[in-house]
Amino acid sequence: MFDNSWEHDTSHLIHIPIERVKAYVLNDFKAANTLELIKAGISLREIEDATNSSIEIKPLPQKLLDKLEQKEMEPRFPFPCEREAQILAYKAWKQNDNKGIFAMATGTGKTVTALNCALKEWQQNNYYKLIIVVPTQALALQWEKEAKAFNFQNIVSTHTEKDWKSILSRYATNSIFNSKKNIVIITTYATFILKHFQSFLYSVKNSEDFIFIADEAHNLGASGPIKKLPIFINNRIGLSATPERIYDEIGSSQLYDFFNSKPPKYTYRFTMKEAIEQGILCHYDYTPVFVELTNIEMSEYRKVTDQLRKFLDPETGKYKPEAEMLLMKRKRIIHKAENKKVAIIRMLDDLTSESKLKYTFVFVPEGYEPDYSVSDSYNIAKEDMHLIDEYSDIFRERRYHYHKFISGLEDAPEILKGFASGDIDVLLSMKCLDEGVDVPRAENAIFLSSTGNPRQFIQRRGRVLRKHQDKEKAHIWDMVVVPPDISENLDNSIEKNLFLGEVKRIINFASLADNRVSIIYSKLNDICMTLGIDLFQILEDEEKQYE
């Protein structure tokens, strides 16, 4: 039959010259899926009918078109196959009564893993109802994009949909008559706790078949969201590279109870070490850059530390809540050490023209930790804005194409696009690159913020470890603050405690770096010996986390 049709010997087939098809596709073809392709084909056939009116071609049965239309609306996995981690996470979630925390390293596909669980449930139930809560507007957009990639329909994002209140109200009313109507709701923690959203949750509280997904789930343990937990929803997924809430045992405990998942293994755990070994994240080199406090800064640090002593609880060994402002003041001394500017100038000036930085994130010290239960964006204080300007000037003076990446930028997508293409060499940011920014092309990171918060530096490291075809490995420089004029004769208890937090961060980075050995047997070891810090015990404790 093929030979006959090729020779134009069949009267019941229409032969459309390939050039006509090519021209049609190039000029007019807008089909986004199979159904539109078929409809486009029908339109093209009708054009041919006009020139071959003697030939009668039966239209496709409406039932078949309806079936195709239904098929095109169904969710599907957007990649050729699932990763082993996604299969194992779903299995563990099912075994834990559809509840759990997925403690997965940044960059290992937490979003896809959670949506895959929802897809699996749809395959069994033939409908889906999701509530996804995220900390920032940027993450809300990212989840919306991923949900569309899975072909989920009826996506309502409270960030992009101005009429979300009435849409959810109508859904709640209609669900009384049709409890299996598909919907994907994406909101931020700040909106989640609002009266309007809580009213919607109350109106659908009998709909136990929702799946509740909390991204960066540690935020759910904050004082606002923890009081609004949707306990009526049985299906729960918490996502976080670092689920534990620092200095908040009560919030952490309530979070673990809600998701029926506890450390260290959680429901499913996928570490950065596993991700690097399996080729999901790229390898990296790590360079600690030691920066001494000035004598004035060290004097101020000692003064604040002395003031803090009266707020130390002797029973728990922790500071009382009244110490918060002093703790912040002391942290800012470390964050904003003046010699960090000297160090980065020296570092940039030592680079040759061939090794000049590109695709580089610079994390500038920030003044405070944002509370995403109050706001879904990070607002920079005037003092902090002055600091990011000072560091920007350093790059400008060395003819780098740089851009400040701060909260509220309307052209943020265009900036990230310019960075990924190489038009922008350096992005300087406070917090805004921590959560919700996915730029695999980034291959360098400079940490100016001496954070002791594991969540922060783990997230930031993950930003530059994503795989990219043009990236062999990542490079990380970390400004490490040390006391001035260290000597063995010094009464160094304060200096020891100052540096101890820095050492823990160094070891966390170094333990997975390709140049691990050279880092440990370097100036780091000398300083630790002087201050009486057991470097190798800290290293051993760090490695136990990956067992």
Residue ranges and their predicted role:
Residues 1, 220, 396-516:
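Conserved RecA-like P-loop NTPase helicase motor core
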Residues 4-74, 234, 307, 467-547:
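Helicase-associated low-complexity regulatory tails and linkers flanking the ATPase motor
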Residues 96-119:
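Walker A/P-loop
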Residues 189-192, 197-245:
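SF2 helicase catalytic motif II
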Residues 222-281:
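Post-DEXD/H (motif II) to motif III coupling segment of the RecA-like Helicase ATP-binding lobe
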Residues 289, 306-415:
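Conserved helicase/translocase motor-coupling segment
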